Regions:
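Intrinsically disordered, low-complexity linkers and stems that provide flexible hinges
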Residues: 106-296
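Beta-strand elements of well-folded, non-transmembrane domains
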Residues: 13-19, 25-29, 64-68, 249-251, ...
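Start-of-domain marker
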Residues: 4-62
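Long, charged all-alpha helical bundle/coiled-coil segments in cytosolic proteins
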Residues: 47-128
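Short intrinsically disordered coil segments
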Residues: 37-43, 76-81, 259-264, 298-303
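C-terminal single-pass membrane-anchor helix
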Residues: 286-319
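Membrane-interface motif at the C-terminal end of an N-terminal transmembrane signal
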Residues: 2-10, 311-316
Length: 319
């Protein structure tokens, strides 16, 4: 059984600039249907899911014919889901037509958001989430949640800093006293290797500030934190997922950053580690020369030159 999800993405660009794009993912039932790297299901996508009963491996396929720019999961849908986009441009010139393909997997910025989680994800021997990592996640989500409701609630910047410092102090003290596990109260088996939002803990530690905070501030902050908890869980879920990207372009390849080439197909192989921090970019270009046009221009140019030489020769004779 697969321990991660393997996804093959194929793109075939047609001479008219349109392109056929296909996703094919395989993995166990829990991983294949989660929201770590969801495949498109709505029109114009043709979506299909299957199960191999012999080894309990599930596969899902989604494909469509597209053109121009296609964005998967725009930023206005929140920070959680993995965003990626593809751009295929066709440019027609007098003597040739060029094609450019650009595929971008948006970087998740793990090292900047939660450095401890980044270290845990790079440690393949780690089987569970360290509680210190969980406090780091909570602090990041709290900070972002408070930032996202600034337009709704007006509180002083100094008050925000005091609240954040208070929570840091709570976690630090609990760690020093060996009670970090107790205050997080994460004992459920189905929460293993998954972050969750400790609502009661957060409500309790907002109490010292309740008199200076607007009504419903705490509840709004909790709600604003949820998408960032989802973001952390998706980041963790993407860990060890692998991808292959294959594409064909009309004409002669002039540029690519592909790992390898097989016949006319460009291949890239990578894992989620490639975009865990920075953007991962796939790019390729090709060109089709119009031989008949080039030949006509060459012949036409030669005739013009020949005619010019004849005229010059006649002028010299007349003179």
């Amino acid at each position: 059984m697969l321990n991660c999800v393997e996804t093959l993405i194929t793109v075939n660009v047609f001479p008219d600039g349109a392109y056929h794009m296909k996703f094919h993912s395989e993995g166990d039932k829990k991983d294949i249907f989660d929201q770590d790297f969801p495949l498109p299901t709505n029109d114009p996508w043709l979506y299909e899911a299957n199960e191999n009963e012999e080894d309990s491996v599930y596969s899902i396929t989604s494909q469509s014919v597209l053109s121009g720019i296609t964005n998967f999961h725009s930023a206005n849908k929140g920070p959680a889901v993995q965003r990626h986009s593809i751009i295929v441009n066709k440019k027609e010139k007098l003597l040739f037509t060029s094609y450019d393909l650009l595929k971008i997997f948006k970087g998740r910025g793990v090292s900047k958001k939660y450095p401890l989680l980044s270290k845990v994800m790079n440690n393949t021997s780690s089987d569970s989430i360290d509680l210190l990592v969980e406090t780091e996640i909570i602090m990041y989500c709290l900070q972002m949640g408070m930032k996202n409701i600034r337009d709704k609630f007006s509180i002083k910047e100094l008050t925000e800093k005091r609240i954040l410092n208070h929570f840091r102090g709570v976690f630090y003290k609990a760690e020093e006293e060996g009670n970090l596990f107790g205050i997080l109260n994460n004992t459920s088996d189905d929460k293993n290797n998954e972050f969750f939002l400790p609502r009661e803990l957060i409500k309790t530690n907002f109490r010292p500030f309740i008199d200076i905070l607007p009504n419903n501030y705490v509840q709004s902050c909790l709600n604003a934190m949820e998408p960032y908890i989802d973001e952390a869980n998706i980041t963790l879920g993407l860990n060890d997922d692998t991808f292959k990207f294959a594409c064909t372009l009309p004409g002669q390849i002039t540029h690519s950053n592909a790992d390898s080439t097989s016949n006319d197909t460009l291949w890239w192989s990578f894992s989620s580690e490639e975009f865990i921090d920075e953007d991962f970019v796939i790019e390729a270009s090709s060109i089709i020369y119009f031989k008949n046009r080039i030949q006509r221009i060459i012949v036409g140019s030669a005739l013009i030159i020949l005619l010019g030489l004849i005229l010059i020769s006649k002028q010299r004779k007349n003179s």
